[in-house]
């Protein structure tokens, strides 16, 4: 190891180049150090790389091609002038030793003991590989003209069979002849694809931010598009639209509160409508009398009592009919006095003046006058909506 270094060598004072020759001889050591410990037996320790796949006979494990070992190398023979070397190494998985040696005749390695080769060899002719011409065949082609002619015919037939394949290979190679244009086209496609991927990532990130999603989104498919086309979404109203809708609702609402029992109130209103309609039909069919109109005939004070009034007044020996019973008894049009059945006539302005002269005006006003005047209603009248005065103003 020290011989490989060109500097930093130490020569002791007793070193004599004529006597020792080199530092290795002075130190009585070999340049390969421990690797040459068996050099006296003709064995050199080297790094050996496995040439092919094998199976170990000791542990039955597979040892791949390219695995390196510390192997003992020694010469065991010659193939003509080429030496044959044998390599002995220990399996790294067990205590078994594997021995291999070179085969110069076949340019290969042969397993001597300790392992089995994994067969992965094929015939070159079957694989359509180029076969090397043997030395004897070369000499025969040079000396024998007939053999050379036959070999030429075989080569031409092989060429005709291989022409389609060769033309296809040439076309494939011509497509890649302009490498600059092809490189530019490939880089342009890569840029377009990268831009599309970036746009898709931006859309996905926007959707994830909008929906607050943390899961990764997968690319959409045709089935997803069909399923999305079947869905229908309604547009959500904004805050202003909702407020406008509420205002419209409030404006169109009724001012009067609805009764709690709307169904019962509707039934009651229906019954009232029916009663009013029946009343109208009854009034239309029956004749209207003076008593029905509520007309009362007012007489003067000096007019003698009418015979009807005298008849109504009970005598001293007769029992008096209570007023409530008389009011409860329904009266027919025949019970009314004859003077009430007359058609009312409007009094003249003169009659109005006479009636006003009968009653002096009080300073209190019309309210006091209405309180002093007794309410005399005819028993046949239904109300006091209309009053007619038939008193003789001229007699007064």
From Swiss-Prot:
Top-rank lineage group of the source organism: Eukaryota
Classification via Pfam families: Saf4_Yju2 (PF04502)
Coiled-coil zones: 182-214
Family matches, as InterPro entries: Saf4/Yju2
GO biological process, one term: response to virus
Keywords: Coiled coil, Nucleus, Phosphoprotein
Start and end residues of each stretch annotated as Disordered: 1-26, 295-396
GO CC annotations, alphabetized: post-mRNA release spliceosomal complex; U2-type spliceosomal complex
Induction field: By poly(RI), poly(RC) and Newcastle disease virus.
Biased composition (Basic and acidic residues): 315-327
Compartment annotation: Nucleus
Free-text function comment from the UniProt entry: May be involved in mRNA splicing.
Assigned protein family: Belongs to the CWC16 family.
Protein name: Probable splicing factor YJU2B
